[in-house]
Design a protein with these regions (language model features):
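Outer-membrane beta-barrel initiation region
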Residues: 25-212, 272-274
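Short, glycine/acidic-rich beta->alpha junctions
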Residues: 69, 167, 232-236, 302-308
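Outer-membrane beta-barrel translocator/channel fold
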Residues: 193-204, 254-289, 294-311
């Protein structure tokens, strides 16, 4: 009887381990896909799944063009293997804030076994599994990473009758760092190389853009961004912008409001005038015509001199 019990236990254990083999294979596929994406340079990469759907989360930092980067990620996920008999979703982040998702649903009886890029549906909907996906631990986090960029800047104007152009050429190194989800700190330094007619302040090394921005996503697919700091065109203040695509994603609403004043850098000292602060705003809509890959915008706006217009 003891031998029978031992044999029964051994059979049960073997059956249990046999059942775990597919689960192990699924986990290895998901983890290996995440590792491959991280190796390519993607940030904030993770995955999860339930009985109906597998979800990958990623942020493109490897490719300058978002479309190219997302396409490369889709190719890798397809090559590593899609889940059998369940859908797959890719959620694309921007500074840890979800933007769009790509959704693939296998069709039963489809003679084509290999999925292609055209089989993925792109939308702003994140699906029900996002509630679980937002809790997973992401690999290759973008937080606290410092990006160093160098921008050559060329400006010219034609205001003097005796001179064709007045020219300003700067080198502008900048750093960007994110300290929490959706946040970005940008600090720029302007180093004058050639200045002909742009004034004595542009002869000095001085800061350029210094801003803190916060991106967020509200319910009903409302995207927002708030920025505080020193902007271009000798402006400082706060600016908020919002974007809301409709269910028919060819149509969308756009809104922006800012409260800014005039200021300038004298070396590393910032000179500003609070009495110049005023409200600017913009409200409009957009239509995308996919047949001709063309977008039309119509906006009513108030500008820096309090003039209003439509464009």
């Amino acid at each position: 009887r003891k031998c029978l019990n031992t044999k029964t236990i051994a059979l049960c254990a073997a059956f249990f381990l046999y059942c775990l083999l597919p689960l192990k294979g699924i986990c290895q596929t998901g983890e290996s896909t995440v590792d491959a994406l991280v190796e390519m340079g993607f940030e904030n990469v993770g995955w999860t799944e339930d009985g109906n759907e597998r979800v990958y989360v990623l942020q493109n930092s490897a490719y300058r063009l978002q479309g190219v980067g997302i396409g490369k990620a889709v190719d890798v996920i397809q090559k590593m293997g899609l889940p059998e008999e369940k859908s797959c979703r890719i959620i694309v982040l921007d500074n840890n804030v979800p933007q769009i998702s790509l959704y693939y649903h296998p069709i039963k009886g489809d003679s084509v076994l290999q999925a292609e890029r055209d089989d993925w549906n792109v939308s702003y909907e994140l699906g029900d599994t996002w509630k679980n996906a937002r809790k997973i631990k992401l690999k290759n986090s973008s937080l606290f990473k410092i990006d160093v960029l160098v921008y050559p800047q060329l400006a010219f104007k034609n205001l003097v009758i005796t001179q064709i152009y007045q020219v300003l050429f700067d080198l502008s190194p900048a750093i960007e760092v994110s300290l929490w989800k959706g946040m970005k700190l940008t600090a720029q330094l302007k180093i004058p190389v050639y200045n002909d007619g742009y004034g004595r302040f542009e002869d000095k090394v001085h800061p350029g853009h210094i801003t803190i921005s916060q991106r967020f996503r509200l319910p009903y697919n409302v995207f927002g961004k708030v920025t505080v700091g020193c902007f271009s065109a000798d402006q400082y203040g706060v600016d908020a912008e919002f974007y809301r695509p409709f269910k028919d994603e060819r149509f969308s609403l756009m809104a922006r409001i800012g409260y800014t004043g005039m200021g300038y850098w004298s070396g590393f000292r910032y000179v500003y005038d609070p009495s110049t602060a005023l409200v600017t705003w913009s409200l409009g809509g957009s239509f995308y015509w996919p047949q001709f890959n063309t977008q039309f915008n119509l906006k009513a706006e108030q500008y820096l001199l309090k003039e209003k217009g439509v464009k």
